[in-house]
Regions:
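Short, intrinsically disordered, charge-biased short linear motifs at domain edges
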Residues: 187-189, 194-203
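A polyampholytic, Gly/Pro-enriched intrinsically disordered region
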Residues: 90, 219-223
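Short amphipathic alpha-helical interaction/hinge segments
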Residues: 160, 222-225
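Short cysteine/histidine-rich metal-coordination sites, predominantly Zn2+-binding motifs
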Residues: 203-204, 224-236
């Protein structure tokens, strides 16, 4: 009996883009006591530079394995992130960002991502899928809202063997009710290395400072009286 090893560690799959939110969520999952299995997506996005940050952030925690799934959403485009003929919004105010669903919305992206994460989680017998969606500072994205996450949880329950047997994989969205400033404060508590993260949509090796994602990030650091350690090509 003394030599009997009981496997008790809980596993979690974490959607990791390399950005501020998803990096915080990875660190939160680790703090919650899970064996972390990050999954990232190379969908030929304009800002593929984020994948390098995802790799670096995952390395800081010494994760078991970092999966990168490859597919090409340029096949049908529909977003400034997958179709370079669509211009990225620049220099917009926070009020302007909140008016409409922006051209940086990628059609059904989180549904695609969560489907891959669900399959991966069930294959490795993980109990949780962590995602860094945020409903308060979202740029109009419909798949970052509480009702969407609730609907996807139902899919997790009904669409898997694990769910039908009464032990559904649960979606954890710890940032969904937090403002961007609160996410940064949480990340500071968790020790997230902001200098390794990436938020810019522009697709270059230096953050532009003027796209919506950069502006949201810079505004949050500024509101807290903090300097964003990420270098920018252009600062206000």
């Amino acid at each position: 009996m003394g030599n009997l090893k009981v496997e008790t560690e809980m596993k979690a799959v974490i959607l990791l883009s390399g950005g501020l939110d998803s990096s915080t969520v990875l660190y939160q999952a680790k703090a919650d006591g899970y064996e972390c299995h990050p999954i990232s997506f190379d969908y030929q996005q304009r800002h593929r530079r984020e994948l390098h940050s995802a790799f670096l952030v995952a390395q800081t925690l010494g994760v078991v394995k970092h999966q990168v799934v490859n597919f090409d959403l340029r096949l049908w485009g529909g977003s400034a992130l997958t179709d370079e003929t669509i211009n990225l919004p620049q220099e917009r105010s926070l009020d302007e960002m909140s008016q409409n669903i922006p051209v940086t919305y990628v059609p059904a992206r989180n549904t695609i991502f969560l489907s891959f994460a669900l399959g991966y989680a069930e294959a490795i017998a993980a109990q949780r899928v962590y995602i860094g969606v945020n409903a308060l500072d979202y740029s109009g994205y419909p798949d970052c809202r509480p009702d969407y996450i609730q609907a996807m949880q139902k899919v997790f329950q009904l669409g898997t063997k694990q769910g039908r047997e009464g032990n559904p994989i649960k979606i954890v969205a710890p940032l969904i009710d937090l403002k961007k400033t609160e996410i940064i404060q949480l990340g500071n508590q968790l020790g997230v290395p902001w200098e390794l993260t990436w938020s810019c949509y522009a697709g270059s090796d230096v953050a532009c400072g003027v796209c919506d994602s950069c502006r949201l990030r810079l505004a949050a650091f500024a509101e807290l009286g903090l300097k964003d350690p990420l270098p920018y090509r252009e600062r206000e």
